[in-house]
Amino acid sequence: MLVESLRATTVAGNPEEFFQYLPSTSRSPQPRQWFEGVTDEAVLSLLAPLEPGVEDTRTAEQWRDQLLSLGRTPNGVWGGKLMWNQVSLLLDRAAGLPHRSGADLRSALDEVLGTDITFIHVYRPDVVDQAVSMWRAVQTQVWRDDATPPAPNDGAEYNAEGIAHLARILRDQERGWRDWFAAENLSPLEVSFTDLVADPQATTAKVLLALGLDPDLAPPPPLKRQSDGRSREWAERYRVEATAKGYPV
């Protein structure tokens, strides 16, 4: 939601998940790749089979240059979104750049993006709601909704084990970012997803201020949150099962 709002300003970069694509397929992780190691057919049967892709043969310099070009607005501001599970992909890509100053994440970011980076940490206080949304999305492969609510019969099915698996991943990702910020002595701009949903325009304005840009450029929300009564029902049902079975919440 935030990246769409920032992109709509036309001055805050063109943020996308530039780091999500696997070099072996040129695709983002597919549903089953989120469940590597899972053998429960009740879960796997709800996920689409893997699709072949095309190997990305760009050099590290070509990858970096294209990434910078695509993510930058005419005023020179670049924007992008990095998930913790994509860090290893970024490190592998950056390893091919010449004159590396180090092999760690901070060095990779500095050498790909430059040293003048504003870190914005978007977090969701409730991992259950996030895991339910993601579980529904990996089944339908519909990740955002800009017009209508999810269809009541979109084909997605409830499965507590599937939700629990994603909740563990999401919890570990959040911990990874917080540990990294602390280790690097960084104080990112903290953006709660709850606040973002409640008032997208005000939250975007806060980010624009942090970037030294005009907060009045914050647009009305371009996306509708992908959540509805069915997702809420699943979250409530999962919390009951989590209490009994020790699933993450």
Regions found by a protein language model. Name each.
Residues 14, 127, 219:
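Glycine-rich, flexible loop/turn motifs
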Residues 74-179, 188, 201-216:
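PAPS-dependent sulfotransferase catalytic domain
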Residues 6, 10, 67-70, 108-112, ...:
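Hydrophobic, Leu/Ile/Phe/Ala-enriched alpha-helical segments that form helix-helix packing faces
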Residues 20-30, 146-164, 179-249:
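The conserved 3'-phosphoadenosine-5'-phosphosulfate
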Residues 36-45, 95-97, 103, 233-249:
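Membrane-proximal basic amphipathic "stem/tether" segments
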Residues 10-12, 117, 186:
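A structural micro-motif
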Residues 1-74, 225-234:
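PAPS-dependent sulfotransferase catalytic core
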